[in-house]
């Protein structure tokens, strides 16, 4: 898990670093894109012929008009009674030709100069040769270059300065335009520019950023914090720094105050809006063919039933430079709509819900949260340190989760109730990561008569099948002859029968072993064989066995004895799990040993049956009453049915681990808070958005005090 988290964390950090470098590199505006934001960075170079034509045109303009230097687009010049044409001076950047397809907006200026028009691409003023006005269409293919002041148009819809003649030789502009032209006749209504203002924050909110990028950045920051808390320590500070930086950047762009640079310009005009048939297209929607003088107006779609009240009347109209209407008349206002019925953007809330839920699921799956939460709460409340050496002192001491406890004394190692799950303990079946500590006498060591009988049976069969030295009860010559023949002699068959009966006293015990002994003793049944042995009739009876038969008999006896030994060992182990009631059970939730004894060389269950019993007795003598030392932070306190108080301890964490615990708890709270808050906001905003247009229409209906219907088409 740690390797996967490390790889993912490093990969994600690298991607974010590359993304930030790319963003910092390309966010710096190119000189031409700073002046003309709509222009792409692709360009071509001026040809020598174009260069000569441009210089001739500029020289001709300088000879004909006296240019005064003026910076690019001074919006107040539109309202001035006199305005001068800005000087056009080529610069080294003028060798780059940029192509763009845009609508050209023309404004008239009250002036005595022959050229009283100003031309704009979006909100940027450009210099357009006046003779090319007749070539303007709705969408224009424009080539332009940058000059010292404003961009110069060198090509318009295929017309270039290469074939440009002196303006003195141009024919007068026809009063009517072609059917595809977007410029009205000269006798169109005069537009009065009242002033130019910045849009309001409410108007900006309609087209401003929706916060999705910032929400995604916050989600990535939360994911980085998860990787930092679950990954190795070496990556923790770097991931935290990146996550905090992303969060600060996102929060700044979400909640920062608007600057003048963010707000677009709004032109406040006074004129008579009229409906026209544009470009020979009479089938356009009625909302798309309203003009104020030469300016084609673009209305919000839901204003359709209302803006017709001002058609043919002098009225105030506020528009963006892209001809989008912001306010008209006394009632129609995007500012008022946003103020009374705010637009509810819920995309960022949905993004934060998905991101928070993803990180929360990862946190619940891969990070244990119980201990960090407990230690964090205890740290905030202020933990105390307690030290005891007796049960009585611990019993009187007020304990709470998060306190530091140091206990030392003599107690009994804990024995789990299920012996099958004790194979992983150092002192199996004892689990010395838990200590029973009370004032009662220690439990007695395990003893069993059944195991003693089994050991006696195994001992006698081993002694007879594997004799050590010569047996005085057997004739030496007979023993030598038997050994040469390869046979094995049982010289005390009666003892085997009696000890088998002592161990297997029930009729259902040791069936196979009893049958084998009956056959060897040539008896009718087991009861008859036992009676003969008890009466002494089998005294001095020797039994000869082939080696195979001897091995079979030995295996039968060992199997029968082992079954009794295992059963008794299990019962004795269960008896060790019955400590006296009361007292304390102190455990380490990390599995640390609380005693200082060397570990056994072999686990208990790797021994044979009888060796297991002997090892259990040795461990019992060692661990039923043993010195212990336990210290750590209390993570849990419970009391069982016997009145024993269970105290779980965890080693005191270092500063880095404690910081991880606190940060994990804080991240969990942040995720839950973010999830709940954004779910509530998502539901509220979705419901308000569903009713927003109905509320706006109801508001306008009340303002105009009538039910409006689309008027007939005006020609």
From Swiss-Prot:
Coiled coil: none annotated. It is a multi-pass membrane protein. It is found in: Cell inner membrane. It comes from the Bacteria. Belongs to the IgaA family. Keywords: Cell inner membrane, Cell membrane, Membrane, Transmembrane, Transmembrane helix. This is Putative membrane protein IgaA homolog. One of its GO terms (cellular component) is plasma membrane. The chain crosses the membrane at residues 2-22, 214-234, 235-255, 349-369, 663-683. Its main location: membrane. It comes from Yersinia pestis.
């Amino acid at each position: 898990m740690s390797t996967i988290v490390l790889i993912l964390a490093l990969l994600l950090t690298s991607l974010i670093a590359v993304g930030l470098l790319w963003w910092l590199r390309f966010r710096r505006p190119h000189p031409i894109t700073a002046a003309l934001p709509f222009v792409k960075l692709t360009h071509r170079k001026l040809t020598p012929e174009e260069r000569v034509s441009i210089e001739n045109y500029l020289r001709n303009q300088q000879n004909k008009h006296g240019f005064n230097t003026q910076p690019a687009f001074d919006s107040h010049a539109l309202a001035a009674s006199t305005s001068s044409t800005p000087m056009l001076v080529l610069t080294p950047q003028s060798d780059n030709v940029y192509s763009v397809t845009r609508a050209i907006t023309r404004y008239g200026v009250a002036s005595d100069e022959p050229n009283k028009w100003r031309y704009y691409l979006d909100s940027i003023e450009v210099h357009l040769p006046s003779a090319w006005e007749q070539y303007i269409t709705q969408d224009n293919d424009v080539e332009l270059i940058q000059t010292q002041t404003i961009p110069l148009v060198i090509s318009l819809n295929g017309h270039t300065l290469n074939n440009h003649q002196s303006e003195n030789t141009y024919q007068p502009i026809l009063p009517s335009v072609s059917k595809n032209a977007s410029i009205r006749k000269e006798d169109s209504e005069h537009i009065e520019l009242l002033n130019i203002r910045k849009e309001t924050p409410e108007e900006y909110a309609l087209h401003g950023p929706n916060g999705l990028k910032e929400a995604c950045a916050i989600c990535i920051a939360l994911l980085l914090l998860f990787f930092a808390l679950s990954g190795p320590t070496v990556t923790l500070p770097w991931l935290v720094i990146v996550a905090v930086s992303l969060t600060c950047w996102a929060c700044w762009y979400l909640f920062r105050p608007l600057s003048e640079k963010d707000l677009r310009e709004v032109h406040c005009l006074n004129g008579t809006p009229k409906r026209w048939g544009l470009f020979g297209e009479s089938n356009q929607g009625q909302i798309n063919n309203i003009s104020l003088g030469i300016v084609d107006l673009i209305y919000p779609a839901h204003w359709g039933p209302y803006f017709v009240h001002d058609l043919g009347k002098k009225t105030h109209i506020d528009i963006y430079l892209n001809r989008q209407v912001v306010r008209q008349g006394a009632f129609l206002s995007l500012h008022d709509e946003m103020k009374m019925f705010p637009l509810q953007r819920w995309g960022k809330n949905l993004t934060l819900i998905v991101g928070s839920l993803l990180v929360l699921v990862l946190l619940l799956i891969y990070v244990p949260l119980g201990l960090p939460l407990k230690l964090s709460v205890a740290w905030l409340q202020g933990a105390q340190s307690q030290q005891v050496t007796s049960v009585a002192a611990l019993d009187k001491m007020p304990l709470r989760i998060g306190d530091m406890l140091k206990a030392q004394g003599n107690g009994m190692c804990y024995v789990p109730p299920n012996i099958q799950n004790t194979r992983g303990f150092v002192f199996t079946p004892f689990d010395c990561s838990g200590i029973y500590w009370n004032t009662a006498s220690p439990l007695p060591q395990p003893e069993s008569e059944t195991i003693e009988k089994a050991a006696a049976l195994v001992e006698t069969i081993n002694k007879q099948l594997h004799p050590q030295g010569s047996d005085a009860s057997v004739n030496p010559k007979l023993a030598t002859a038997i050994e040469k023949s390869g046979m094995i002699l049982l010289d005390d068959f009666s003892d085997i029968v009696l000890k088998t009966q002592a161990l297997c006293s029930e009729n259902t015990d040791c069936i196979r072993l009893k049958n084998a002994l009956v056959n060897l003793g040539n008896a009718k049944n087991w009861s008859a064989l036992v009676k003969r042995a008890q009466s002494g009739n089998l005294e001095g009876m020797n039994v000869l066995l082939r080696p195979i038969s001897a091995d079979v008999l030995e295996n039968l006896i060992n199997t029968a004895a082992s079954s009794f030994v295992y059963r008794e060992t299990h019962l004795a182990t269960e008896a060790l799990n019955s400590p006296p009631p009361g007292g304390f059970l102190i455990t380490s939730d990390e599995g640390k040993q609380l005693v200082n004894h060397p570990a056994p060389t072999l686990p208990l269950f790797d021994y044979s049956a009888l060796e297991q019993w002997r090892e259990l007795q040795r461990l019992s003598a060692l661990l039923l009453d043993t010195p212990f030392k336990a210290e750590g932070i209390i993570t849990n306190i419970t009391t069982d049915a016997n009145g024993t108080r269970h105290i779980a301890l965890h080693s005191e964490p270092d500063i880095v681990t404690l910081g991880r615990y606190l940060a994990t708890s804080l991240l969990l709270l942040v995720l839950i808070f973010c999830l709940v808050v954004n779910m509530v906001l998502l539901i509220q905003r979705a419901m308000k958005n569903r009713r927003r247009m109905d509320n706006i229409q109801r508001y306008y209906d009340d303002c105009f005090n009538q039910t409006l219907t689309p008027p007939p088409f005006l020609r």
